[in-house]
Amino acid sequence: KRQNIIEHNMNRLGLEQYDYKASFYLSKKEKEWAKQQTIKFDKPILAICTKSKEEVKNWPEENWLELIQNLNVNFSIIQLGDETEPTFECVHRYAGKLSMRESAAILANADYFIGPDSLLMHIANGLNIQSVIIFGGSRSVNCFGYSENTNLSNTPDCSPCWIHSTDNKCNESLKCLHNISVIKVLNSLMDLIKK
């Protein structure tokens, strides 16, 4: 199995997992502002972000659409991220409209978060938001996944590939990411809710 330098060194030290916890702090003013923005929601709040800056981390848009259609009856779904986020019906779109800190403040009011390995994954962890993270296989969950999260990944022979830039292309059609089903994400969220 291919390993990156962190995994290699962890194995040499006899460590199976490095448990890191992020921290993110909001001011009282930021918290109050976000509370006013989210008080209108009458169902549990599910925050989503569908895109990372790296294409190899982006779960297919049609999967997101199916996921949203399955969840919008029971959740107020808020969409965070930047202006490149796709537009979906049945979500409260904040994507592309907020600063990073405003997005974090809104996220702090969410009950759950679903998204890719991205900045918002780290912020959600720092805010103690229960999360389902769709990793695929381009990165190692052992290196970047938080143990509190439900980290969904596949590990075909080519993974982790560590492809970062748009110049590098996946020769396997991102099967590690595309093989994570909507049902798997739904079930993972339901398991979080039961905890």
Residue positions per predicted region:
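Catalytic machinery of carbohydrate-active enzymes
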Residues: K1-K195
